[in-house]
Protein backbone atom coordinates (compact mmCIF):
# COMPACT_ATOMS: atom_id res chain seq x y z
CA UNK A 1 0.00 0.00 0.00
CA UNK A 2 1.20 3.52 -0.78
CA UNK A 3 2.90 4.98 2.35
CA UNK A 4 1.39 8.38 1.53
CA UNK A 5 -2.10 6.90 2.01
CA UNK A 6 -1.00 5.35 5.31
CA UNK A 7 0.20 8.68 6.67
CA UNK A 8 -2.93 10.41 5.40
CA UNK A 9 -4.96 8.00 7.54
CA UNK A 10 -2.80 8.70 10.60
CA UNK A 11 -3.25 12.45 10.15
CA UNK A 12 -7.01 12.07 9.78
CA UNK A 13 -6.95 10.32 13.16
CA UNK A 14 -4.74 13.01 14.74
CA UNK A 15 -6.59 16.03 13.33
CA UNK A 16 -10.03 14.72 14.27
CA UNK A 17 -8.90 13.43 17.67
CA UNK A 18 -10.15 9.90 17.04
CA UNK A 19 -9.27 7.49 19.82
CA UNK A 20 -8.04 4.55 17.75
CA UNK A 21 -7.06 3.41 14.28
CA UNK A 22 -10.01 0.99 14.32
CA UNK A 23 -12.45 3.88 14.80
CA UNK A 24 -10.66 5.91 12.11
CA UNK A 25 -10.94 3.13 9.52
CA UNK A 26 -14.65 2.70 10.32
CA UNK A 27 -15.26 6.41 9.62
CA UNK A 28 -13.23 6.29 6.40
CA UNK A 29 -15.56 3.58 5.04
CA UNK A 30 -18.64 5.83 5.19
CA UNK A 31 -17.21 9.36 4.96
CA UNK A 32 -17.14 10.78 1.41
CA UNK A 33 -14.69 13.55 2.32
CA UNK A 34 -12.18 11.09 3.79
CA UNK A 35 -12.49 8.80 0.75
CA UNK A 36 -11.90 11.75 -1.58
CA UNK A 37 -8.85 12.81 0.42
CA UNK A 38 -7.42 9.28 0.36
CA UNK A 39 -8.30 8.75 -3.30
CA UNK A 40 -10.46 5.69 -2.54
CA UNK A 41 -13.78 5.69 -4.45
CA UNK A 42 -16.94 4.11 -3.04
CA UNK A 43 -17.08 0.44 -3.95
CA UNK A 44 -13.39 -0.02 -3.26
CA UNK A 45 -12.19 -1.48 0.05
CA UNK A 46 -10.49 0.82 2.54
CA UNK A 47 -7.32 -0.25 4.40
CA UNK A 48 -7.74 -2.52 7.41
CA UNK A 49 -7.05 -0.94 10.80
CA UNK A 50 -4.02 -3.21 11.34
CA UNK A 51 -2.35 -2.11 8.09
CA UNK A 52 -0.48 0.86 9.55
CA UNK A 53 0.81 -1.05 12.58
CA UNK A 54 2.17 -3.84 10.35
CA UNK A 55 3.79 -1.33 8.03
CA UNK A 56 5.21 0.53 11.03
CA UNK A 57 6.95 -2.62 12.27
CA UNK A 58 8.28 -3.59 8.84
CA UNK A 59 9.04 -0.24 7.20
CA UNK A 60 8.93 2.83 9.43
CA UNK A 61 10.02 1.75 12.92
CA UNK A 62 13.76 2.33 12.43
CA UNK A 63 13.47 5.39 10.19
CA UNK A 64 13.50 9.04 11.20
CA UNK A 65 10.55 9.98 8.99
CA UNK A 66 8.32 10.90 11.97
CA UNK A 67 10.78 13.51 13.20
CA UNK A 68 11.37 14.77 9.64
CA UNK A 69 7.64 15.31 9.16
CA UNK A 70 7.44 17.27 12.42
CA UNK A 71 10.52 19.37 11.53
CA UNK A 72 9.15 20.09 8.05
CA UNK A 73 5.85 21.37 9.48
CA UNK A 74 7.75 23.65 11.91
CA UNK A 75 9.77 24.96 8.96
CA UNK A 76 6.47 25.65 7.17
CA UNK A 77 5.35 27.69 10.20
CA UNK A 78 8.63 29.62 10.07
CA UNK A 79 8.03 30.26 6.36
CA UNK A 80 4.58 31.69 7.17
CA UNK A 81 6.23 33.96 9.78
CA UNK A 82 4.36 32.28 12.64
CA UNK A 83 7.49 31.56 14.70
CA UNK A 84 9.43 34.32 16.46
CA UNK A 85 12.40 32.11 17.41
CA UNK A 86 13.54 34.15 20.43
CA UNK A 87 11.05 33.50 23.26
CA UNK A 88 10.03 30.02 24.40
CA UNK A 89 8.11 28.23 27.15
CA UNK A 90 8.87 24.72 28.35
CA UNK A 91 6.96 22.33 30.60
CA UNK A 92 6.12 18.65 30.84
CA UNK A 93 2.85 16.76 31.04
CA UNK A 94 2.16 13.15 31.90
CA UNK A 95 0.39 10.59 29.72
CA UNK A 96 -1.04 7.52 31.38
CA UNK A 97 0.74 4.41 30.14
CA UNK A 98 -1.21 1.37 29.04
CA UNK A 99 -0.26 -0.42 32.27
CA UNK A 100 -1.94 -1.39 35.55
CA UNK A 101 -0.42 0.59 38.43
CA UNK A 102 -0.92 -2.36 40.80
CA UNK A 103 1.03 -4.87 38.70
CA UNK A 104 4.74 -4.20 39.08
CA UNK A 105 8.06 -5.59 40.29
CA UNK A 106 10.23 -3.88 42.91
CA UNK A 107 13.77 -3.50 41.61
CA UNK A 108 16.97 -2.00 43.00
CA UNK A 109 18.79 0.16 40.45
CA UNK A 110 22.39 1.25 41.00
CA UNK A 111 23.91 4.22 39.20
CA UNK A 112 26.84 6.60 39.54
CA UNK A 113 25.70 9.96 40.86
CA UNK A 114 26.22 12.70 38.30
CA UNK A 115 28.91 15.16 39.33
CA UNK A 116 29.25 18.85 38.55
CA UNK A 117 32.97 18.90 37.81
CA UNK A 118 32.92 22.58 36.90
CA UNK A 119 31.56 23.39 40.37
CA UNK A 120 34.08 21.09 42.09
CA UNK A 121 36.92 22.95 40.35
CA UNK A 122 35.56 26.34 41.45
CA UNK A 123 35.19 25.15 45.06
CA UNK A 124 38.77 23.85 45.15
CA UNK A 125 40.07 27.08 43.62
CA UNK A 126 38.36 28.99 46.43
CA UNK A 127 39.87 26.67 49.07
CA UNK A 128 43.37 27.03 47.62
CA UNK A 129 42.88 30.80 47.55
CA UNK A 130 42.08 30.66 51.30
CA UNK A 131 45.16 28.50 51.97
CA UNK A 132 43.20 25.31 52.57
CA UNK A 133 43.58 21.80 51.19
CA UNK A 134 41.34 21.06 48.16
CA UNK A 135 38.61 18.43 48.46
CA UNK A 136 39.00 15.02 46.83
CA UNK A 137 35.78 14.26 44.99
CA UNK A 138 34.95 10.67 44.13
CA UNK A 139 32.19 8.97 42.20
CA UNK A 140 29.29 8.01 44.47
CA UNK A 141 27.13 4.98 43.76
CA UNK A 142 23.41 5.50 44.33
CA UNK A 143 20.88 2.77 44.98
CA UNK A 144 17.21 3.36 44.27
CA UNK A 145 14.13 1.21 44.76
CA UNK A 146 11.90 1.62 41.72
CA UNK A 147 8.66 0.10 40.49
CA UNK A 148 8.85 -1.59 37.09
CA UNK A 149 5.58 -2.32 35.32
CA UNK A 150 4.95 -5.91 34.31
CA UNK A 151 2.95 -4.68 31.31
CA UNK A 152 5.05 -1.79 29.96
CA UNK A 153 8.59 -1.95 31.30
CA UNK A 154 9.67 1.29 29.61
CA UNK A 155 7.10 3.41 31.45
CA UNK A 156 8.07 5.05 34.74
CA UNK A 157 6.17 5.25 38.03
CA UNK A 158 4.96 8.83 38.42
CA UNK A 159 4.26 10.21 41.90
CA UNK A 160 3.95 13.88 42.71
CA UNK A 161 1.96 15.83 45.26
CA UNK A 162 -1.67 16.42 44.28
CA UNK A 163 -1.25 14.36 41.10
CA UNK A 164 -2.48 10.93 40.14
CA UNK A 165 0.04 8.16 40.78
CA UNK A 166 0.73 5.43 38.27
CA UNK A 167 2.85 4.37 35.32
CA UNK A 168 3.28 7.28 32.94
CA UNK A 169 5.26 8.81 30.12
CA UNK A 170 6.32 12.46 30.18
CA UNK A 171 6.14 14.82 27.23
CA UNK A 172 8.74 17.60 27.64
CA UNK A 173 7.36 20.24 25.29
CA UNK A 174 8.64 23.61 24.10
CA UNK A 175 6.43 26.15 22.34
CA UNK A 176 7.18 29.46 20.65
CA UNK A 177 5.77 32.69 22.05
CA UNK A 178 4.35 34.21 18.86
CA UNK A 179 1.67 31.73 17.73
CA UNK A 180 2.16 28.82 20.13
CA UNK A 181 3.81 26.61 17.51
CA UNK A 182 5.29 23.46 19.08
CA UNK A 183 9.03 23.38 18.31
CA UNK A 184 9.95 20.32 20.36
CA UNK A 185 8.24 17.41 22.12
CA UNK A 186 10.50 14.88 23.81
CA UNK A 187 9.23 11.69 25.48
CA UNK A 188 10.80 10.15 28.60
CA UNK A 189 9.74 7.75 31.32
CA UNK A 190 7.39 9.12 33.94
CA UNK A 191 10.03 9.05 36.69
CA UNK A 192 12.45 11.43 34.92
CA UNK A 193 12.65 14.90 36.47
CA UNK A 194 11.55 17.83 34.28
CA UNK A 195 14.96 19.52 34.47
CA UNK A 196 17.01 16.51 33.28
CA UNK A 197 16.49 16.78 29.48
CA UNK A 198 16.04 20.58 29.40
CA UNK A 199 19.53 21.72 28.32
CA UNK A 200 19.87 19.04 25.62
CA UNK A 201 16.46 19.93 24.17
CA UNK A 202 17.23 23.66 24.23
CA UNK A 203 20.40 22.93 22.26
CA UNK A 204 18.39 20.71 19.91
CA UNK A 205 15.95 23.45 18.87
CA UNK A 206 18.75 26.01 18.66
CA UNK A 207 20.77 23.95 16.17
CA UNK A 208 17.85 22.27 14.36
CA UNK A 209 16.04 25.48 13.45
CA UNK A 210 18.77 28.10 13.96
CA UNK A 211 16.85 29.93 16.69
CA UNK A 212 18.50 32.78 18.61
CA UNK A 213 17.05 32.11 22.07
CA UNK A 214 16.67 35.29 24.13
CA UNK A 215 13.98 34.46 26.72
CA UNK A 216 12.70 31.35 28.49
CA UNK A 217 9.71 30.96 30.80
CA UNK A 218 9.68 27.82 32.96
CA UNK A 219 8.17 26.71 36.27
CA UNK A 220 10.03 26.13 39.54
CA UNK A 221 10.86 22.52 38.67
CA UNK A 222 13.58 23.81 36.34
CA UNK A 223 15.30 25.90 39.03
CA UNK A 224 18.58 23.97 39.12
CA UNK A 225 22.20 25.13 39.17
CA UNK A 226 22.94 23.66 35.73
CA UNK A 227 20.03 25.45 34.03
CA UNK A 228 20.87 28.75 35.73
CA UNK A 229 24.45 28.37 34.51
CA UNK A 230 23.19 27.62 30.98
CA UNK A 231 21.03 30.77 30.96
CA UNK A 232 23.87 32.95 32.27
CA UNK A 233 26.45 31.63 29.79
CA UNK A 234 24.07 31.98 26.82
CA UNK A 235 22.77 35.41 27.84
CA UNK A 236 19.17 34.16 28.12
CA UNK A 237 16.59 36.11 30.12
CA UNK A 238 15.22 33.23 32.18
CA UNK A 239 12.15 33.43 34.43
CA UNK A 240 11.55 30.63 36.94
CA UNK A 241 8.47 30.12 39.08
CA UNK A 242 8.80 31.02 42.77
CA UNK A 243 10.19 28.25 44.93
CA UNK A 244 10.48 28.06 48.71
CA UNK A 245 13.66 26.63 50.20
CA UNK A 246 14.18 25.33 53.72
CA UNK A 247 11.71 25.80 56.56
CA UNK A 248 9.77 28.98 57.44
CA UNK A 249 12.02 29.39 60.50
CA UNK A 250 15.25 29.16 58.49
CA UNK A 251 13.98 31.60 55.85
CA UNK A 252 12.92 34.05 58.54
CA UNK A 253 16.32 33.73 60.24
CA UNK A 254 18.30 34.46 57.06
CA UNK A 255 16.09 37.45 56.22
CA UNK A 256 17.37 39.15 59.38
CA UNK A 257 20.70 39.68 57.63
CA UNK A 258 21.79 41.87 54.73
CA UNK A 259 24.69 40.98 52.44
CA UNK A 260 27.28 43.63 51.52
CA UNK A 261 28.98 42.57 48.29
CA UNK A 262 31.87 45.07 48.47
CA UNK A 263 32.97 43.84 51.92
CA UNK A 264 31.81 40.21 51.51
CA UNK A 265 30.03 40.27 54.88
CA UNK A 266 26.55 39.85 56.35
CA UNK A 267 25.24 42.22 58.99
CA UNK A 268 22.15 41.91 61.18
CA UNK A 269 19.62 44.60 60.28
CA UNK A 270 18.43 45.24 63.85
CA UNK A 271 21.68 45.11 65.84
CA UNK A 272 24.31 45.76 63.16
CA UNK A 273 26.28 42.66 64.21
CA UNK A 274 28.69 41.54 61.47
CA UNK A 275 29.12 37.98 60.17
CA UNK A 276 32.38 37.47 58.29
CA UNK A 277 33.56 34.87 55.81
CA UNK A 278 36.57 33.09 57.31
CA UNK A 279 37.53 30.85 54.42
CA UNK A 280 35.27 27.90 55.27
CA UNK A 281 33.46 26.37 52.29
CA UNK A 282 31.83 22.93 52.19
CA UNK A 283 31.82 20.31 49.43
CA UNK A 284 28.54 21.62 48.02
CA UNK A 285 29.88 25.14 47.54
CA UNK A 286 28.35 26.90 50.57
CA UNK A 287 30.50 29.54 52.30
CA UNK A 288 30.16 30.04 56.05
CA UNK A 289 29.68 33.52 57.53
CA UNK A 290 30.08 33.65 61.34
CA UNK A 291 30.12 36.21 64.13
CA UNK A 292 33.10 36.47 66.47
CA UNK A 293 31.92 33.87 69.01
CA UNK A 294 30.55 31.54 66.28
CA UNK A 295 27.03 31.50 67.72
CA UNK A 296 25.43 32.79 64.52
CA UNK A 297 26.05 31.24 61.11
CA UNK A 298 24.71 32.12 57.65
CA UNK A 299 25.50 30.03 54.57
CA UNK A 300 25.90 31.55 51.11
CA UNK A 301 26.43 29.57 47.92
CA UNK A 302 29.45 30.37 45.78
CA UNK A 303 27.01 31.31 42.99
CA UNK A 304 24.35 32.99 45.13
CA UNK A 305 24.49 35.98 42.77
CA UNK A 306 22.76 33.81 40.15
CA UNK A 307 19.76 33.44 42.48
CA UNK A 308 19.68 37.21 42.89
CA UNK A 309 19.77 37.74 39.11
CA UNK A 310 16.85 35.37 38.48
CA UNK A 311 14.92 36.78 41.43
CA UNK A 312 15.21 40.23 39.83
CA UNK A 313 14.08 38.73 36.51
CA UNK A 314 11.02 37.15 38.14
CA UNK A 315 9.99 40.35 39.94
CA UNK A 316 10.59 42.67 36.98
CA UNK A 317 7.69 43.87 34.82
CA UNK A 318 9.06 41.96 31.83
CA UNK A 319 9.50 38.81 33.93
CA UNK A 320 5.95 38.93 35.31
CA UNK A 321 4.52 39.29 31.80
CA UNK A 322 6.67 36.43 30.52
CA UNK A 323 5.68 34.05 33.34
CA UNK A 324 2.01 34.96 32.98
CA UNK A 325 2.18 33.97 29.30
CA UNK A 326 3.73 30.59 30.14
CA UNK A 327 0.44 29.00 31.19
CA UNK A 328 -1.36 30.67 28.26
CA UNK A 329 1.03 28.98 25.84
CA UNK A 330 2.53 25.67 26.91
CA UNK A 331 -0.32 24.69 29.26
CA UNK A 332 -2.80 25.61 26.52
CA UNK A 333 -0.84 23.45 24.08
CA UNK A 334 -1.10 20.43 26.40
CA UNK A 335 -4.83 21.02 26.91
CA UNK A 336 -5.41 21.24 23.16
CA UNK A 337 -3.50 17.99 22.56
CA UNK A 338 -5.43 16.09 25.21
CA UNK A 339 -8.86 17.50 24.49
CA UNK A 340 -8.82 17.67 20.69
CA UNK A 341 -6.14 15.29 19.46
CA UNK A 342 -6.53 12.12 21.54
CA UNK A 343 -3.36 12.66 23.58
CA UNK A 344 -4.66 11.98 27.09
CA UNK A 345 -3.53 8.34 27.16
CA UNK A 346 -0.50 6.54 25.76
CA UNK A 347 -1.92 4.13 23.21
CA UNK A 348 1.44 2.47 22.56
CA UNK A 349 4.05 0.75 24.70
CA UNK A 350 7.67 1.84 24.78
CA UNK A 351 9.42 5.21 24.63
CA UNK A 352 10.27 4.93 20.91
CA UNK A 353 6.71 4.26 19.73
CA UNK A 354 5.33 7.01 21.93
CA UNK A 355 7.96 9.42 20.62
CA UNK A 356 7.00 8.66 17.02
CA UNK A 357 3.31 9.10 17.80
CA UNK A 358 4.04 12.38 19.59
CA UNK A 359 5.89 13.78 16.56
CA UNK A 360 2.78 13.09 14.43
CA UNK A 361 0.31 14.51 16.96
CA UNK A 362 2.36 17.70 17.36
CA UNK A 363 2.78 18.01 13.58
CA UNK A 364 -1.01 17.76 13.19
CA UNK A 365 -1.55 20.33 15.93
CA UNK A 366 0.90 22.71 14.25
CA UNK A 367 -0.82 22.21 10.88
CA UNK A 368 -4.14 23.14 12.44
CA UNK A 369 -2.52 26.15 14.12
CA UNK A 370 -1.01 27.33 10.82
CA UNK A 371 -4.43 27.19 9.11
CA UNK A 372 -6.18 29.09 11.92
CA UNK A 373 -3.49 31.77 12.29
CA UNK A 374 -3.32 32.44 8.55
CA UNK A 375 -7.09 32.83 8.52
CA UNK A 376 -7.06 35.18 11.53
CA UNK A 377 -4.49 37.60 10.12
CA UNK A 378 -6.64 38.23 7.05
CA UNK A 379 -4.63 36.21 4.57
CA UNK A 380 -6.20 33.76 2.19
CA UNK A 381 -7.87 31.17 4.44
CA UNK A 382 -6.10 27.82 4.45
CA UNK A 383 -8.77 25.15 4.78
CA UNK A 384 -7.80 21.99 6.63
CA UNK A 385 -7.96 20.01 3.37
CA UNK A 386 -5.58 22.56 1.80
CA UNK A 387 -3.13 22.11 4.66
CA UNK A 388 -3.36 18.34 4.26
CA UNK A 389 -2.83 18.66 0.51
CA UNK A 390 0.33 20.69 1.08
CA UNK A 391 1.42 18.19 3.69
CA UNK A 392 1.14 15.36 1.15
CA UNK A 393 3.58 17.17 -1.14
CA UNK A 394 5.98 17.51 1.79
CA UNK A 395 5.49 13.88 2.73
CA UNK A 396 6.27 12.64 -0.78
CA UNK A 397 9.45 14.70 -0.77
CA UNK A 398 10.52 13.24 2.58
CA UNK A 399 9.73 9.67 1.53
CA UNK A 400 11.83 10.08 -1.61
CA UNK A 401 14.73 11.11 0.62
CA UNK A 402 14.17 8.10 2.87
CA UNK A 403 14.29 5.21 0.44
CA UNK A 404 15.43 2.95 3.25
CA UNK A 405 11.84 2.70 4.53
CA UNK A 406 10.89 0.66 1.47
CA UNK A 407 13.37 -2.09 2.29
Ranges and model annotations:
Residues 1-11:
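Basic, short loop/linker segments at the boundary and entry of helix-turn-helix/winged-helix-like folds
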Residues 34-38:
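Short amphipathic alpha-helical interface patches used for protein-protein assembly/oligomerization
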Amino acid sequence: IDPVVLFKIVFIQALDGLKSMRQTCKKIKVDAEYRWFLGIPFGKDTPHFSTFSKNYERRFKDSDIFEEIFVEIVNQAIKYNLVDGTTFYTDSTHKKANANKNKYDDEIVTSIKERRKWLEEEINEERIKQGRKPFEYKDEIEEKHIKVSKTDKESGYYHRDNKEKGFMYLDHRTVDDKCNIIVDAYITKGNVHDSVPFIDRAEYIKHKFGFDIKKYGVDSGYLTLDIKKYFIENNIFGVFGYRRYGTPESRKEKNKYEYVKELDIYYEKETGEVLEYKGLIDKNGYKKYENTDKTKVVRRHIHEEWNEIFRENRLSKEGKELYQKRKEHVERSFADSKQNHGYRYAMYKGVKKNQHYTWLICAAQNMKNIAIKNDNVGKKPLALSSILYKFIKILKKIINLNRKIYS
